[in-house]
From Swiss-Prot:
The active site is at residue 144. It comes from Shigella boydii serotype 4 (strain Sb227). Pathway: tRNA modification; N(7)-methylguanine-tRNA biosynthesis. It catalyses: guanosine(46) in tRNA + S-adenosyl-L-methionine = N(7)-methylguanosine(46) in tRNA + S-adenosyl-L-homocysteine. SUPFAM superfamilies: S-adenosyl-L-methionine-dependent methyltransferases (SSF53335). Belongs to the class I-like SAM-binding methyltransferase superfamily. TrmB family. Its EC number is 2.1.1.33. It holds the Pfam family Methyltransf_4. This is tRNA (guanine-N(7)-)-methyltransferase. Monomer.
Length: 239
């Protein structure tokens, strides 16, 4: 599933405008398993949107590094990462309820207690609920590239959004992006390189090899079989 959980239009103060969104709410049909997960596991792992800042130690019951993933699709890679790194905490945001249900079901099956999920617009969550300087990592994997030129403004990686992400990262925190659309990778690189306070972690100052910490998704595997490339970008907050 494409990741498309952002409304990237901002006013002069960096606040999200509501006119244009980069996602359409395509809720789709819930399977019985997804419906069961939403009914039974959301009360434990789900986080309702509010205008109060989250207290991560209270939310997870401990002090630990927090990774935020924006647009986790069906949640397979997010659950895999949370399982592989029990010493870290993970918060995922996804607007499509079938994906949220699938993620909850998988997390419950794995017995995870270091994963929480939200079903809301990610920009609003970042503005209203994520404290500044609180995140170890922000992950944005395979966002909708909006191929047509007239739709490029819908791309979520724009300067105001990247600045917003930077404000939520701790010093030394990392914004990790991945895309299978080379023009979007070039756009991401241009945007991120223009912002003071980010350092590109690529030795060649462009893209990084896929880190072992990012699982290969089914979507990505299919792309590899078709000969499609994937570009990973990792930028560290340095000030």
């Amino acid at each position: 599933m494409k990741n498309d959980v952002i409304s990237p239009e901002f006013d002069e103060n960096g606040r999200p405008l509501r006119r244009i969104r980069s996602f359409v709410r395509r809720q789709g049909r819930l399977t019985k398993g997804q419906e069961h997960a939403l009914e039974n596991y959301w009360p434990v792992m789900g986080v309702e949107f509010s205008e109060d800042m989250l207290d991560f130690p209270a939310l997870f019951g401990r002090e630990a590094p927090v990774t935020l993933e924006i647009g986790f699709g069906m949640g397979a890679s997010l659950v895999a990462m949370a399982k592989d790194r029990p010493e870290q905490d993970f918060l995922g945001i996804e607007v499509h309820s079938p994906g949220v249900g699938a993620c909850l079901a998988s997390a419950h099956e794995e017995g995870l207690n270091n994963l929480r999920v939200m079903c809301h617009d990610a920009v609003e969550v970042l503005h209203k609920m994520i404290p500044d300087n609180s995140l170890r990592m922000v992950q944005l994997f395979f966002p909708d590239p909006w191929h047509k030129a007239r739709h490029n403004k819908r791309r979520i990686v724009q300067v105001p959004f990247a600045e917003l992400v930077k404000s939520k990262l701790q010093l030394g925190g990392v914004f990790h992006m991945a895309t299978d659309w080379e023009p979007y990778a070039e756009h991401m690189l241009e945007v991120m390189s223009s912002i003071d306070g980010y350092k590109n972690l690529s030795e060649s100052n462009d893209y990084v090899p896929r880190p072992a910490s990012r699982p290969v998704t089914k979507f990505e595997q299919r792309g590899h079989r078709l000969g499609h490339g994937v570009w990973d970008l990792m930028f560290e907050r340095v000030k």
